[in-house]
């Protein structure tokens, strides 16, 4: 997102620009656990020289005005190699976090927001929370080592919901 909050032409709102490619990097939680891929699951493992974190791809939704305001920047979140995107769906009564073979730029190019694949990224200092757009008040979370990345509605309890996104320059 590129914004000029005080710009008169933008009406005091952020001005969004089209992007030609996502930004990439890695994600870790405050316990220095990084995201890795084990089979079809994202798992949090302690950072070490022998661990290769997944490369995440992030791109801002082109149509933030179509979504709830004040919750954070709406982003699509994917991984590279294999190219997959995170999305949320209800399994039984519980919203769950899934990976789906999906090109992030195909989502970005859709004529309207694809809510199951969108997350509100709310930044606080160097960390961010990632809240499901499809399931408000459900956040991406990690827990103990070698456990899958999940969705939780229990902020600040037994799960880590604050993540650092380390962007490649």
From Swiss-Prot:
Disulfide bonds: none annotated. Its main location: cytoplasm. GO terms for cellular component: cytosol; extracellular region; extracellular space; nucleoplasm; plasma membrane. Keywords: Cytokine, Cytoplasm, Immunity, Inflammatory response, Innate immunity, Secreted. GO terms for biological process: cell-cell signaling; cellular response to lipopolysaccharide; cytokine-mediated signaling pathway; immune response; inflammatory response; innate immune response. Highly expressed in tissues containing epithelial cells: skin, lung, stomach and esophagus. Expressed in bronchial epithelial. In skin is expressed only in keratinocytes but not in fibroblasts, endothelial cells or melanocytes. Up-regulated in lesional psoriasis skin. Expressed in monocyte-derived dendritic cells and M1 macrophages. It is found in: Cytoplasm; Secreted. The keyword Ribosomal protein does not apply. Pfam families: IL1. It comes from the Eukaryota. Induction: By TNF and by IFNG/IFN-gamma in keratinocytes. By Aspergillus fumigatus conidia in peripheral blood mnonocytes; involves CLEC7A and SYK. GO terms for molecular function: cytokine activity; interleukin-1 receptor binding. Residues 1-17 form a propeptide. N-terminal truncation leads to a dramatic enhancement of its activity (>1000-fold). Proteolytically cleaved by cathepsin CTSG. The keyword Cytoplasm applies. InterPro entries: IL-1_fam, IL-1RA/IL-36, IL1/FGF. Gene3D superfamilies: 2.80.10.50. Interacts with cargo receptor TMED10; the interaction mediates the translocation from the cytoplasm into the ERGIC (endoplasmic reticulum-Golgi intermediate compartment) and thereby secretion. Belongs to the IL-1 family. Cytokine that binds to and signals through the IL1RL2/IL-36R receptor which in turn activates NF-kappa-B and MAPK signaling pathways in target cells. Part of the IL-36 signaling system that is thought to be present in epithelial barriers and to take part in local inflammatory response; similar to the IL-1 system with which it shares the coreceptor IL1RAP. Seems to be involved in skin inflammatory response by acting on keratinocytes, dendritic cells and indirectly on T-cells to drive tissue infiltration, cell maturation and cell proliferation. This is Interleukin-36 gamma. It comes from Homo sapiens (Human). The lineage of its organism: Eukaryota, Metazoa, Chordata, Craniata, Vertebrata.
